């Protein structure tokens, strides 16, 4: 993912300055289509429960495609602050960002991700600096979408990292079983 910068409620976030190779960058966007259909059930989930389930190396971004983007992220910030206790707020300080720009006008690497993904409401950047789409939110057991499925994506990206690093170790011989 190439460099990008976005205005946030706390100042401009510069990806190139923040990139360490140890963190995951996770983006959740609110979206309402022309018929009024939206992902408000997912967007409106309890952010405290969601955040508590994420790995500690996540930078979490909230943004919106809607014309009400500023109000959307201000309200999301209030919901986050109301759902975390003081210790959790301290632990996540500087790691939760509220994008103060309409998502469809974002440029740079993040803008490219938004333009190229089929459903850019939930996506991330892994530790290899690769753009990642999220999987399905559908829960077969309840026959509904379950926003908590989003918690698993960054855990999986973290789990893939040491495996991929190990594949490049000169002491490892990779053998293709099926081609």
Predicted regions and their residues:
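Non-globular targeting/processing and membrane-anchoring segments
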Residues: 1-32, 38-65, 69-119, 124-179
């Amino acid at each position: 993912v190439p460099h990008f910068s976005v205005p946030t409620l706390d100042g401009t976030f510069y990806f190139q300055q923040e990139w360490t190779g140890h963190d995951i960058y996770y983006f959740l966007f609110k979206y309402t289509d022309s018929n009024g259909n939206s992902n408000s059930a997912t967007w409106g989930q309890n952010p405290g429960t969601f955040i508590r389930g994420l790995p500690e190396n996540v930078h979490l971004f909230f943004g919106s495609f809607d014309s009400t983007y500023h109000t959307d992220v201000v309200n999301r910030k209030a919901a986050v602050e109301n759902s975390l206790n003081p210790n959790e707020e301290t632990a996540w300080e500087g790691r939760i960002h509220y994008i103060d720009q309409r998502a469809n006008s974002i440029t740079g690497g993040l803008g490219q991700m938004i333009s190229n993904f089929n459903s850019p409401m939930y996506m991330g950047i892994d530790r290899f600096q690769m753009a990642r789409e999220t999987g399905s939110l559908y829960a077969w057991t309840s026959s509904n979408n379950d926003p908590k499925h989003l918690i698993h994506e960054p855990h999986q990206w973290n789990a893939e990292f040491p495996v991929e690093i190990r594949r490049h170790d000169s002491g490892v011989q990779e053998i293709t079983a099926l081609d």
